[in-house]
Structure formats: C-alpha cells, structure tokens
Regions:
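Zinc-dependent metallopeptidase catalytic helix centered on the HExxH motif
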Residues: 1-74
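General structural signal for secondary-structure boundaries
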Residues: 4, 21, 77, 82, ...
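Intrinsically disordered, low-complexity segments enriched in small/polar residues
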Residues: 5, 78-79, 98, 153
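Active-site nucleophile-His-acid catalytic modules used for acyl/amide transfer and hydrolysis
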Residues: 40-44, 92, 119-120
Length: 165
C-alpha cells in the first residue's frame, strides 16, 4: 500500500486540508484492509468488480467516501465507459463491471434491496465459484426477477435525484 507523495505534498502546502487528508487515508485503509479478508476463491482475475469493486463497496458502506464522490461516480461513469469502450480500453463488457467506485458504490447501493447484500456477495463467491459474475451474484442474492440492467438504471436515477437535493 502506498500514498502518493504528490498528495502528501498538497497536505503539507495546505492545498488539501488535514481533515480531507485524514478522511481520504481512512477510506484507503478501509479499502486495503478489505482485501486482507476478502474471499475471491475461483473468481477469474478478469472480474475487477469482484476484487476492487468489493473493497470500494465496503469503503462506501463504512462512510469512507463522500456523497459527492459517490454521486459523481454514478453520474459520470457512463461517459467514461463509453469513451473507453469505443477506443478498446476497457476489459469490461458492462459498465457495472468497472472496478473501484463504479461497481463498488453500485454494490453498496444494492443494500437498499437487502441490507446484508455485501456479506451475501462474499458468500456468493464461494457458492458460485468459477461461475461467479456480478450479474449472477445479484440474482443469487436478490432472486431471479432482479435484472442487473434494470437495477443499474435505478441506481443512476437515484443518484440523479440525490444530486438535485
């Protein structure tokens, strides 16, 4: 684990407040400590939503992300994804599979359907094994009637409504 010396320099110069730096460092630690206890089992390493997304989901659930960052990620991921997909720079066929905040904040939002979603997501990794995907995990946890495409659209709509407040 490492912290950008440029970021630390911004704290020293006063460009970043000590409170903001403390908040960010706490969030980074939550993310990295999640990896220590994370089960990835037989999940293909090409499933970045599982590894990095899960760590950011826990970070978000623990209050390690600002509301503004979470909302902006939901609202801006589409343009980022479309741009990178056109140029062939994304290994993810679906936007919700993008690692870190994009999939992570979405996973955390899915707790609105099941408050125990993140724990069950970890269980799904063991239960589904090499067949694991976020799409399959969502249906394993919430039921066959829940389509990830519809949930993603609802998540973005929720972010839009929060952004207006």
């Amino acid at each position: 684990m490492r912290m950008s010396s440029e970021y630390v320099g911004q704290v020293n110069s006063g460009a970043v407040s000590m409170d903001d730096a403390t908040f960010e460092i706490r969030g980074v630690l939550i993310h990295e400590f999640t990896h220590l206890v994370q089960k990835t089992g037989a999940v293909d390493s090409n499933q970045p939503s599982c590894i990095e997304g899960m760590a950011d989901a826990v970070r978000s659930a623990c209050g390690g992300v600002t509301d503004a960052n979470r909302i902006n990620t939901a609202l801006n991921s589409g343009a980022y994804y479309d741009e990178n997909r056109k140029s062939g720079n994304t290994p993810c066929p679906y936007i919700w599979q993008l690692p870190y905040g994009t999939s992570g904040y979405f996973m955390n939002w899915l707790r609105t359907y099941d408050g125990d979603f993140l724990r069950k997501l970890t269980v799904s990794i063991v239960q589904l094994g090499s067949q694991w995907s976020l799409e399959k995990a969502v249906q394993y946890i919430l039921g066959e009637n829940y389509k990830i495409e519809d949930l993603w659209k609802e998540y973005v709509e929720d972010a839009k409504s929060e952004n207006v407040k």
